[in-house]
Amino acid sequence: MAAYQTYTMAGIKEDFADWVSNISPEYTPLISMIRKFPVHNTMFQWQWDVLKDVDTENQHNEASDAKDVELTPTTVVQNYVQIMRKVVFVSDSANAVSSHGREKELFYQLKKAAKELKRDNEGIFLLKDRAGDAGSATKPRLTASFGSLIDASMKKTADLDEATLFEMTAKLYTEGADPTLIMYHPSNANFFASLQEKSGTRMRIFENDKRFVKQVEYIVDPLGQELKCIPNRWCPEDATYIFNPSDLGMAVLRAPKKVALAKSGSAEKYMIEQEVGFRLNNPKAAALIIGKYKEGGNGGGESVKS
């Protein structure tokens, strides 16, 4: 007589993992590193100024009159806070049943929504050319993005290569900025790795080190400015930002808040909402390269750290 096998059994208890795998990226480098400051209006403003050019003819006769000079006012910049939200709508039945990997479906969905909101925030701030808009009764307010607040003279549309990168870091140095970071889309990582090479030959081989390292963590430009290289998934593929985090800020009119909305039948609806905006203290304190890296392009830098 044949042995009784599982193939003919009834009532076998299913084996279901009590967790949920989700590898969707959550890290938001930009908003994690910049300062948050409160605002009390939907429009917020700030000022910037500049010193006059150096006057190498600043020489005067003894006992001469001090003549009047024309003074220039500060420049006022404005931006707006933008309402961002996520809505979760879960039936009472879905919230009551026992589920693998979470205790209550509502709490699980709210946790996901909070992470998604943070990613939306990062992506909006990093847009290249999204202008601010005061909005109206029928149109939402828009916060101007990082790229749109950078002065036109500090932007360049070109392939991402060594010459362009160092041209922009030199511009920042000349203007008096103090850049410490380069933020780029991961698709351009090979450009930064290429800076370790010269004429197709790898420059650094460490004895007894079995690792093959392509990553470049820091770049020192010809003027001695040391910049940390940070990939950011939420950067546009053709945008590379050069800046100092201390020159950026996130205006907060309303911090993220979970709000229970009116119950609809046998379902619960919650909203997570915030009202925030972006600030760049000075339009010449950051630079933007609009373009992608082309394999085989102009790499070959020497001043790198990994």
Curated annotation (Swiss-Prot):
The keyword Ribonucleoprotein does not apply. The keyword Hydrolase does not apply. One of its GO terms (cellular component) is T=7 icosahedral viral capsid. Keywords: Capsid protein, T=7 icosahedral capsid protein, Virion. It holds the Pfam family SU10_MCP. It comes from the Viruses. InterPro entries: SU10_MCP. It is found in: Virion. Its main location: virion. This is Major capsid protein. It comes from Serratia phage KSP100 (Serratia marcescens bacteriophage KSP100).
